[in-house]
Every structure is written in structure tokens, then in C-alpha cells.
């Protein structure tokens, strides 16, 4: 199984990756992308089961990437968790409209993120 971590902040990508490293022992592959366009390239090539997606990014924001995954690519089996500092209800609704499965605000609890990843992957 594959997880894609997408964030334009290198330290946050590393933090998320470190939070999920234990899953690699269970056969999960972690992939990284620094912006929305790169994320879509990885998604098309690797077809991850889970995408952890920052909202505010250059080139293509997380809402647009999520909508592309769900509606243009038709990858309805790909589970998307939006990660963002934008915690207002209007942002949550926009995420739902884009097809996101869950929405977590930053700063996030690494243990909660791990629990969500395990639940999605069924491990």
C-alpha cells in the first residue's frame, strides 16, 4: 500500500513522514511531493491508497488537487485527508465539496494521524 505526503514546507513533509515511518515495517510505501502539480504526477504514477494533502500550496492548491483526484481522475478509492492551518467551517465545507474524506488542522497530533492512516489502510 502507498501513502503520498504533500506539503510545500520541507519540515512539515519530514514531520509527517517521521510520524508514519513505522508503517513501512508493515509494507507501506511513503512518497513525497512538494506542490500540487508534483502530487498529481505521483498520484498518476503510483496510485496511492491514502493522500495526506496540504491545502495552501503553490502551483495547485490542495482543494484543486483533491477535486482532480476524485472527479477528473475518478480515483474514488483514494482516500484524501486535507491537512491545513485553515480551520474555519467554510474551509471544511470547501474540502468536502472537493471530495476530501477528512480534514485535520495544523498543528496536528502525530498519534492521531497515525491512527487515521492505520484505519484507512486497514492495518
Q: What do these predicted ranges mean?
A:
Residues 30-37, 92, 110:
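Conserved Asp/Asn-Gly motif in the active-site loop of CheY-like receiver
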Residues 108-117:
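C-terminal output helix
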Amino acid at each position: 500500500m502507498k501513502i503520498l505526503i504533500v506539503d510545500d514546507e520541507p519540515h512539515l513533509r519530514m514531520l509527517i513522514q517521521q510520524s508514519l515511518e513505522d508503517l513501512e515495517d508493515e509494507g507501506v510505501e511513503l512518497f513525497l511531493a512538494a506542490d500540487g502539480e508534483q502530487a498529481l504526477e505521483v498520484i498518476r504514477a503510483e496510485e496511492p491508497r491514502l493522500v495526506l494533502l496540504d491545502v495552501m500550496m503553490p502551483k495547485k492548491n490542495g482543494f484543486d488537487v483533491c477535486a482532480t483526484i476524485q472527479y477528473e481522475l475518478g480515483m474514488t478509492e483514494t482516500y484524501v485527508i486535507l491537512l491545513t492551518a485553515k480551520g474555519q467551517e467554510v474551509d471544511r465545507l470547501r474540502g468536502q465539496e472537493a471530495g476530501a474524506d477528512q480534514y485535520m488542522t495544523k498543528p496536528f497530533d502525530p498519534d492521531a494521524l497515525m491512527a487515521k492512516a492505520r484505519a484507512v489502510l486497514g492495518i
